[in-house]
Design a protein with these regions (language model features):
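Patatin-like phospholipase
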Residues: 3-93
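Short coil/turn connectors at secondary-structure junctions
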Residues: 1, 29, 106-109
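Active-site-adjacent alpha/beta core region of enzyme catalytic domains
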Residues: 75-120
Length: 120
């Protein structure tokens, strides 16, 4: 069995995005993929076969004030507007949608690691 874990780390996980692009370029596959936070986004794009998708999110879209800004922080308490990232940009009709059909048909097991916010 081959497995991979991407522990995320917000925008620091651009490194992970590059690693998954390398895996796609070289046909590397895994039986299980574990993702935490931003690592889930990297793995979703990897399993959907969308090379360079997350790199563009980190380098192109992140420059938009809707994506990441002090205004977001003042309005919502979060520097990054995750509704914009995972809704507006990534949904089926978004600017750069995740290929859900390919993701769902990928035989790899995708395990998302999360904790309940109030109890841990």
């Amino acid at each position: 069995m081959r497995a991979v874990i991407d522990v995320g780390g917000g925008t620091r996980d651009i490194f992970g995005a590059g690693v998954f692009d390398y895996f796609l370029e070289h046909g590397v596959t895994f039986d299980r993929c574990y993702g935490v936070s931003a690592g889930c986004a990297n793995i979703a794009s990897f399993l959907a076969g969308q090379q360079h998708r997350n790199y563009e999110f980190y380098t192109e879209y992140a420059m938009r004030k809707e994506y990441m800004s002090l205004d977001n922080f003042i309005k919502t308490g979060s520097y990054v507007d995750l509704d914009y990232v995972y809704g507006t940009l990534s949904n089926s009709y978004g600017e750069y949608p995740l290929n859900f059909e390919v993701l769902k048909s990928n035989p790899s097991e995708f395990i998302i690691i999360a904790a309940e916010a109030n109890t841990g």
